[in-house]
């Protein structure tokens, strides 16, 4: 009888162990509960005209915490570009004036993670030209061999609003990415709820040794097997998603993907309720 009970106990333990292994433990989070400047121990800011020929000038003044939210605000502006040089190599330095400002926050050098679950609750602006994003990048290699995960992008594709969930890695050509992209027409969400854009939603990434899975309100938008995400020759055939990634939150305007900016919609607010990182613990 004792042997039977022991065998039953061992079998039950063996059955329960895989279930326990799937439990998620909160590793760190930012709930944005303190009014004022975002936590310098977690977040840094980009500055200036940065990427994708976007129209906004990034600056820290356009992001703050208030009433339990991180607020990123895009504004109209009109002032000289302090980095202006008419013959500069970088496109941003060739712009004489700053017409819009916004903010991009990132955790590079402060908080990164390898595998796990990331959840971000946010309310996004959807006016013309808005290009909000939740994304991650790797360190130690130049883009795209560092790897990029777009947990959320919103912009217009051929003038039609879309939510995007993408993964990118390096090819055999410098600065040329291989993309696994899922574009979901915004109408897919607003048909279910006409007030979708006025509400907060949860974007989630589940990332392990086998795949990256991207969700919106528990709906799977894209699943990318890591067996497919091997860099080309520039990245020495490494897999960027076997290394840590850091987080970026930004509100871009116009540029290569954002589309025509609606100047009557300003200021635009991108509001983030929380960022949470979980890992599986045995």
Give the positions of each predicted feature.
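Positively charged n-region of N-terminal signal peptides that target proteins for export
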Residues: 1-4
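Short amphipathic alpha-helical "recognition" segments used for binding
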Residues: 6-7, 157
């Amino acid at each position: 009888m004792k042997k039977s009970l022991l065998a039953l106990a061992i079998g039950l333990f063996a059955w329960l162990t895989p279930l326990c292994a799937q439990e998620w433990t909160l590793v760190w989070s930012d709930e944005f509960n303190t009014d004022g400047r975002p936590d310098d121990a977690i977040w840094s800011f980009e500055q200036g005209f940065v990427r994708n020929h976007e129209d906004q000038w990034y600056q820290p003044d356009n992001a703050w915490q208030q009433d339990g939210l991180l607020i990123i605000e895009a504004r109209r502006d009109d002032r000289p570009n302090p980095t202006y040089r008419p013959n500069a190599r970088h496109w941003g330095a060739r712009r004489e004036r700053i017409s819009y400002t916004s903010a991009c926050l990132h955790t590079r050098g402060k908080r990164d993670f390898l595998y796990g679950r990331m959840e971000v609750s946010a309310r996004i602006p959807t006016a013309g030209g808005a290009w909000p994003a939740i994304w991650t990048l790797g360190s130690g290699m130049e883009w795209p061999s560092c790897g990029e995960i777009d947990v959320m992008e919103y912009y217009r594709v051929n003038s039609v609003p879309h939510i995007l969930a993408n993964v990118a890695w390096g090819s055999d050509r410098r600065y040329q990415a291989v993309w696994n992209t899922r574009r979901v027409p915004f109408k897919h969400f607003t048909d279910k709820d006409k007030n979708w854009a006025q509400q907060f939603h949860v974007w989630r990434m589940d990332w392990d040794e086998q795949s990256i899975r991207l969700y919106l309100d528990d709906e799977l938008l894209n699943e990318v097997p890591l067996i497919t995400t091997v860099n080309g020759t520039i990245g020495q055939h490494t897999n960027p998603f076997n290394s840590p990634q850091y987080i970026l939150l930004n509100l871009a305007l116009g540029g290569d993907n954002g589309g025509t900016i609606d100047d009557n919609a300003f200021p635009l607010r991108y509001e983030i309720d929380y960022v949470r990182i979980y890992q599986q613990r045995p």
